[in-house]
């Protein structure tokens, strides 16, 4: 038998090879699913293995009792690389995983209560059913999208809409759990981002052109589900400028005289007229109504729409801003 055949045959999706000796099934103790790892000494074995430079990627640790395990790479800037590890239903209560790399790991239904996950990387990790009560999650890198969300997008590309719906339901559940835990830990910046993603996942479960999905998308664009007050400011500025342009071409009455954009007038006169319309648009949006300009004809409909939208937008901005600042 060649030397390579004595080696563990595990190779991860990034082509990292395990250098350990293989057991009867061609895999080492840590990568084999046929080896019993349910003993109480598994925690000490894993700590010793990690501290002595063991290959930690892709370990099969389903159902293992790893409470209070110390997997902090002391004295090094980078933590242990636990990429692609499978912790399905493992118990990691009070575990120390500071700065660990858990990218692409499966933490499905893992018990991480009171564990320390500060500064860990969880890119593309499966977090479905994870237990986080008391877990420290500051400065975690969750990535732009979670694992199930990426699967949902891939399913849509392949036109597997039923599977995509299931993945979006799972994504909503995960974001809800992360949001609730962030709120309980006082991490309100995280909570704000997670509520936005949670509601986005809920929207994606609706039929593509349904009224609920369209309204939800509009709310997202308008104020980021209440988490983006500056979007309201941007919308307000855009609306004021659009209405100002419309006023300039539909005309306004000023002290009994009717004014409108004139292509034959000088550039200076038209610019002055536009700024007058901009002033009127601001006054109308804020519902001040000084009375120096009055709308005529089509301008009345534009002014009515802008005044209604302005009063609603200002009130919404106050609510969203106060909510954001008082967290």
Segments the model singles out, each with a brief description of its role:
Residues 2-25, 32-194:
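Tandem repeat scaffolds
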Residues 188-206:
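Extended, hydrophilic extramembrane loops/domains of integral membrane proteins
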Residues 34, 179-183, 200, 204-205, ...:
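Membrane-proximal alpha-helical anchors
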Residues 236-277:
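Outer-pore turret/helix-boundary of cation channels
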Residues 265, 269-327:
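Pore domain of cation channels
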Residues 208-252:
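Transmembrane alpha-helical segments and their cytosolic interface motifs
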Residues 193-196, 220, 303:
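Short amphipathic alpha-helical coupling elements at transmembrane boundaries
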Residues 145, 150-152, 203-217, 269-276, ...:
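Coil-to-alpha-helix initiation sites in intrinsically disordered, low-complexity, charged segments
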């Amino acid at each position: 038998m060649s030397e390579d055949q004595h080696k563990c045959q595990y190779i991860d999706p990034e082509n990292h090879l395990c250098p350990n000796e293989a057991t009867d099934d061609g895999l080492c103790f840590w990568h084999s699913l046929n080896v019993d790892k349910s003993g109480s000494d598994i925690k000490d074995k894993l700590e010793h293995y990690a501290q002595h430079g063991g290959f930690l990627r892709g370990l099969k640790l389903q159902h293992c009792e790893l409470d209070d395990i110390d997997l902090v790479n002391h004295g090094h800037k980078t933590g242990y690389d636990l990429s692609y590890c499978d912790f399905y239903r493992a118990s990691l209560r009070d575990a120390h995983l500071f700065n660990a790399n858990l990218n692409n790991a499966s933490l499905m239904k893992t018990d991480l209560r009171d564990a320390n996950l500060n500064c860990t990387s969880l890119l593309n990790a499966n977090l479905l059913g994870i237990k986080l009560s008391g877990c420290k999650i500051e400065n975690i890198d969750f990535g732009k999208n979670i694992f199930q969300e990426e699967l949902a997008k891939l399913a849509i590309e392949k036109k597997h809409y039923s599977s995509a719906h299931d993945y979006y339901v799972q994504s909503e559940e995960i974001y809800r759990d992360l949001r609730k835990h962030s709120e309980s830990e006082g991490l309100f910046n995280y909570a704000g981002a997670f509520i936005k993603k949670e509601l986005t996942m809920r929207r994606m479960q609706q039929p593509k052109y349904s009224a609920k999905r369209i309204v939800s998308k509009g709310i997202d664009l308008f104020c980021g589900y209440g988490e983006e007050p500056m979007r309201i400011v941007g919308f307000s500025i855009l609306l004021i400028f659009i209405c100002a342009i419309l006023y300039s071409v539909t005309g306004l009455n000023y002290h009994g005289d009717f004014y409108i954009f004139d292509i034959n007038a000088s550039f200076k006169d038209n610019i002055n007229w536009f700024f007058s319309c901009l002033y009127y648009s601001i006054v109308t949006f804020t519902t001040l109504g000084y009375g120096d300009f009055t709308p005529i004809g089509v301008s009345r409909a534009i002014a009515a729409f802008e005044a209604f939208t302005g009063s609603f937008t200002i009130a919404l901005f106050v609510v969203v801003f106060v909510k954001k600042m008082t967290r």
